[in-house]
């Protein structure tokens, strides 16, 4: 049994590793998009204009309230009806990026809220504009505070990248499904998939824990 498993694992691993490459592409692409959009939602939520704040809250509540898989289906299957056709990989990145942007927005919001108001008032008394206060004071402090939850969000996104398999993105889970169907070697295939996900997520988990310990000392 162990020998059979190793033989099959050696045969299947190159196929699954191609899926790993796509998983990394989806995760990194969606992560970058989620950071940009999350920062936008967070800044809109701090706007002095009430309509802008309402738009931010509405977007966050709507996106958070709709399952990720439905958002992926909408991007991949519905947007083409409006003339915007995307390939599966792009749809997966956009769908996951939008879905996770609301969590990134909360990370940024918590970071902004952690900034001591006295520091902001001191900066204003020195004649700094609101833009400079945001760029030179609030953003660096907010990012520092948001780093640990940002790491946890990245780990969740890595695992949820498997949902992109539902729109035929050939990431790790999809590659494994096709391999299992064609070979009937379910135990070998899904064991390898689990091991590969752990190999990607555990280093991130350890890095987040290390970062949290360092932040706690400061």
Whereabouts are the PLM-identified features?
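Transmembrane alpha-helices and adjacent helix-loop boundaries
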Residues: 1-218
